């Protein structure tokens, strides 16, 4: 039910005022070829649109006088929806990919994790690298700091880090952002 109300609200934002529902006495008219026709009384603008068998659509009510366009409303509405769909397609959502490891990690395992991070960063994702401690291992935090410095150095060509590292319980993590090219 909640999704339908969201859709309805987004539809209302895209609704345009057309023809007799325009309540301004004087308007600036743009025709279907994007030429400015000038400033008209609303009655004359409606007659002009009716003669061309098109609609009068309020484009901008913030200007003085408000801007209206003489166009086919159905085609205009379709074009607006198509534009919004295209804009939505082009949006890229940044996701956070997490790579977990221990502070004592072998060279090959380390290289595998670095390669994963490189792959994620090239795709434009943020990478969260977590170092996990078990039991009393938390006392070896200096070894973890050295590992984090090594990771930062290994990925310095592709990533920049927000902070040096954050400590959360028995985990230490660092957030890496892809470098802007």
UniProtKB/Swiss-Prot annotation:
Origin superkingdom: Eukaryota
Signal peptide: none
A GO biological process held by the record: ribosome disassembly
UniProt keyword annotation of Plastid present: yes
Biological role stated in the UniProt entry: IF-3 binds to the 30S ribosomal subunit and shifts the equilibrium between 70S ribosomes and their 50S and 30S subunits in favor of the free subunits, thus enhancing the availability of 30S subunits on which protein synthesis initiation begins.
Family under the similarity heading: Belongs to the IF-3 family.
A molecular function GO annotation: ribosome binding
Name assigned to this protein: Translation initiation factor IF-3, chloroplastic
Protein localization: Plastid, Chloroplast
UniProt keywords, alphabetically: Chloroplast, Initiation factor, Plastid, Protein biosynthesis
Record carries keyword Nucleotide-binding: no
Species in which this protein is naturally found: Galdieria sulphuraria (Red alga)
Cellular component terms per the entry's GO annotation: chloroplast; cytosol; membrane
Subunit details: Monomer.
SUPFAM superfamilies named in the record: Translation initiation factor IF3, C-terminal domain, Translation initiation factor IF3, N-terminal domain
């Amino acid at each position: 039910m909640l999704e339908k109300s969201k859709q309805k609200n987004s539809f209302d934002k895209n609704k345009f005022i057309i023809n007799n529902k325009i309540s301004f006495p004087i308007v600036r008219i743009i025709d279907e070829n994007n030429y400015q026709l000038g400033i008209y009384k609303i009655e004359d603008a409606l007659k002009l649109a009716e003669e061309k068998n098109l609609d009068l659509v309020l484009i901008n009510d913030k200007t003085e006088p408000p801007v209206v366009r003489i166009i086919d409303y159905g085609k205009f509405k379709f074009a607006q929806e198509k534009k919004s769909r295209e804009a939505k397609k082009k949006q890229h959502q940044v996701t956070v990919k997490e790579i977990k490891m221990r502070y004592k990690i072998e060279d090959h395992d380390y290289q595998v994790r670095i390669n994963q991070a490189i792959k994620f960063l090239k795709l434009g994702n943020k990478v969260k690298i977590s170092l996990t401690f078990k039991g009393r291992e938390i006392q070896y935090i200096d070894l973890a700091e050295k590992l984090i410095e090594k990771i930062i150095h290994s990925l310095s060509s592709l990533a920049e880090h927000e902070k040096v590292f954050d400590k959360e319980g028995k985990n230490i993590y660092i957030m890496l952002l892809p470098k802007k090219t």
